[in-house]
């Protein structure tokens, strides 16, 4: 991909102003109502008094644990309220993940969350990418990391009791296998 294509396909700055802000709900993810004014994408006009609700969130670290000795990745299954409300499958499959604490760096959070949710230690950690998870709904930024791990001798369940985590660990190959 050319540098021009990378710029064209990247998020872009846009002139905007928050003209009013109201807290609608506190909690794990506070909900705010904002009134904003912003320039149109082509710069020919300005939209005024646009109402938007946004969930406020801390940044998150999401981990892809990979064991090169077994060519397996670790995924987890746990109860998720969003899955329970939208599907018959409340025990959702996902990658280990968690929120950054205070001014914690994303890579440090990735190593900590990997240990808390799987019992695994990161032998090496590399950033993959960062993304806004759902920019029309919330301000959460998720930082993805690859962590090299050794899965030998690990239990099939993990999680922190004080965070009400009941996590099942699953191991699977990222490569297609013959049936």
Feature-to-residue mapping (PLM):
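Hydrophobic pocket-lining residues within nucleotide cofactor-binding pockets
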Residues: 68, 100, 122, 149-150, ...
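Active-site-adjacent beta-strand/loop module that shapes the phosphate/pyrophosphate-binding cleft
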Residues: 30, 36-41, 134-155
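A contiguous pocket-lining binding segment that forms or flanks enzyme active sites
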Residues: 104-147
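Acidic, metal-coordinating catalytic segment for phosphate/diphosphate chemistry
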Residues: 26-69
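Alpha-helical and coiled-coil interaction segments, frequently adjacent to or embedded
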Residues: 2-16, 20, 25-28
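Conserved Nudix-box catalytic region and its N-terminal flanking loop in Nudix hydrolases
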Residues: 2-7, 52-57, 64, 69-112, ...
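Conserved small/polar residues in nucleotide/adenosyl-binding loops
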Residues: 171-178
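A generic structural signal for well-ordered coil/turn residues at beta-strand boundaries
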Residues: 30, 59, 89, 138-141, ...
């Amino acid at each position: 991909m050319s540098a021009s294509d990378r710029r064209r396909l990247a998020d872009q700055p846009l002139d905007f102003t928050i003209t009013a802000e109201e807290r609608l709900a506190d909690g794990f993810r506070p909900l705010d109502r904002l009134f904003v004014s912003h320039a149109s994408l082509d710069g020919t006009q300005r939209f005024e008094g646009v109402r938007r609700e946004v969930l406020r969130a801390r940044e998150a670290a999401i981990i892809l644990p990979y064991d090169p000795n077994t060519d397996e990745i670790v995924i987890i299954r746990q109860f998720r309220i969003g899955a329970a409300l939208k599907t018959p499958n409340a025990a959702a499959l996902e990658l280990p993940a968690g929120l950054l604490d205070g001014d914690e760096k994303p890579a440090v959070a990735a190593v900590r969350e990997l240990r808390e949710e799987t019992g695994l230690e990161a032998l090496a950690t590399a950033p993959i990418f960062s993304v806004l998870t759902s920019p029309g709904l919330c301000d959460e930024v998720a930082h993805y990391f690859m962590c090299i791990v050794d899965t030998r001798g690990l239990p099939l369940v993990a999680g922190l009791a004080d965070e009400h985590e009941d996590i099942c660990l699953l191991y699977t190959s990222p490569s297609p296998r013959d049936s």
